[in-house]
From Swiss-Prot:
<dbReference type="InterPro" id="IPR037025">
    <property type="entry name" value="PSII_cyt_b559_asu_sf"/>
</dbReference>
<dbReference type="Pfam" id="PF00283">
    <property type="entry name" value="Cytochrom_B559"/>
</dbReference>
<comment type="subunit">
    <text>Heterodimer of an alpha subunit and a beta subunit. PSII is composed of 1 copy each of membrane proteins PsbA, PsbB, PsbC, PsbD, PsbE, PsbF, PsbH, PsbI, PsbJ, PsbK, PsbL, PsbM, PsbT, PsbX, PsbY, PsbZ, Psb30/Ycf12, at least 3 peripheral proteins of the oxygen-evolving complex and a large number of cofactors. It forms dimeric complexes.</text>
</comment>
<dbReference type="InterPro" id="IPR006216">
    <property type="entry name" value="PSII_cyt_b559_CS"/>
</dbReference>
<comment type="function">
    <text>This b-type cytochrome is tightly associated with the reaction center of photosystem II (PSII). PSII is a light-driven water:plastoquinone oxidoreductase that uses light energy to abstract electrons from H(2)O, generating O(2) and a proton gradient subsequently used for ATP formation. It consists of a core antenna complex that captures photons, and an electron transfer chain that converts photonic excitation into a charge separation.</text>
</comment>
<comment type="similarity">
    <text>Belongs to the PsbE/PsbF family.</text>
</comment>
<keyword id="KW-0479">Metal-binding</keyword>
<dbReference type="GO" id="GO:0009535">
    <property type="term" value="C:chloroplast thylakoid membrane"/>
</dbReference>
<dbReference type="InterPro" id="IPR013081">
    <property type="entry name" value="PSII_cyt_b559_N"/>
</dbReference>
<feature type="binding site" description="axial binding residue">
    <location>
        <position position="23"/>
    </location>
    <ligand>
        <name>heme</name>
    </ligand>
</feature>
<dbReference type="GO" id="GO:0020037">
    <property type="term" value="F:heme binding"/>
</dbReference>
<keyword id="KW-0349">Heme</keyword>
<dbReference type="InterPro" id="IPR013082">
    <property type="entry name" value="PSII_cytb559_asu_lum"/>
</dbReference>
<keyword id="KW-0813">Transport</keyword>
<keyword id="KW-0812">Transmembrane</keyword>
<feature type="transmembrane region" description="Helical">
    <location>
        <begin position="21"/>
        <end position="35"/>
    </location>
</feature>
<keyword id="KW-0472">Membrane</keyword>
Amino acid sequence: MSGSTGERSFADIITSIRYWVIHSITIPSLFIAGWLFVSTGLAYDVFGSPRPNEYFTESRQGIPLITGRFDSLEQLNEFSRSF
């Protein structure tokens, strides 16, 4: 049998009151913080994603789909000019 490292076992940790006091606060807090991050629209600003009403503008109603293999750079430039 191998030697002990002196650390507490996992079963000992998850059955302790201290573990559940700490995690009963932090887990719901992380969930609420994530929900607020997404619901307020801050996630769109931080990651630069377009909001749902900004995907298609009045001038650009089609999907920016690259169809040519050899002229893909020109198509990308055309799509970027339409923004």
